[in-house]
Amino acid sequence: MKKVLKVIGIIVAVSAVLVTVLLVSLGKMAKEKNEKYYEYTNPVGAIEKKYSLMGSSEVSTIEFKSDNAQIGIFVIFYPAELNNEMRKCPVVLWANGTGSKSDTYTSFLKHLASWGFVVVSNNDENTRTGESLNAGIDLLIKENDNPDSVLYQKIDLDNIGIGGHSQGGPAVFNMATVQPHADMIKTVYAVSATSSYHTKVFGDGWEYDISKVNVPTLLTAGTQTFDAGTATSADQESDEKAGIMQGICPLWSLEENFRLLPDVEKVYVRKTNVDHGDSHLQFDAYMTAWFRYYLTDDKEAGNAFFGDAPELSTNANYQDFKAYKK
């Protein structure tokens, strides 16, 4: 009996070790996948493949404490060569999704900075009003004028883009329309932006008037359950028995926002087999191309969206592509 118990004990101990090793290995794999997410997004198009890779710049990071408790800190990612060179770089400010902080998006924002952008994030977990984006621009203006700052006279304030995920969608729309620095925004990107159905339900600063966004705008979302839902219009209430679910950013919402946008260059597209949680990662290459096109005049990047045969119109991983160019 003692031998049997001893054998069982050994088996249990070995199993525990194996489980521990497995969990550690899975943890390392998950960490690596998050840090190198761009290797797992399955790029197909030539432009998508190019901008899914890291850019040519190493990336430096600097943090600033905010006087606003909701914002907490600002984190700025920038091309490391700015530590030793005097040149200006365009800007992208990022608006977090609900409950997310800057570190949720670290690898994603470093990727963007590696393509030549000064990228600003913060720890605001409720970004919808756009106030924290506006505060980020205040910080950039201050640092650009500060002779003691590593970013002194290196921030191209004439080329500012904003992007946001989920609740960050209303944030960028509100930043571009009602915040004090709205007139400094050159282009807007929103991935899985909260639909008007939900913003009306939530109230409290969630609502936005996208018809007042007067700069080029890219709208993206996934086709899976939480983003797409099953509802086909804002008029349908979620009804589990009837099989109706209002997704966070369904196709009808993309169509509605595209239609309401004024006479500006605009695009919407969905990626197949993608859902809300990591949609920002899945669209990263085309987001980078969008900002490169509008903030650095990268003509090749623009071919993803416009022209006789825009890449997104033929990329098999994407659907429902629609574009308008003046």
Predicted segments with their positions:
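Alpha/beta-hydrolase-fold serine-hydrolase catalytic core, especially in secreted/extracellular enzymes
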Residues: 2, 263-265, 271-326
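Gly/Ser-rich "nucleophile elbow"/oxyanion-hole loop immediately N-terminal to the catalytic nucleophile
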Residues: 83-88, 131-171, 178-179
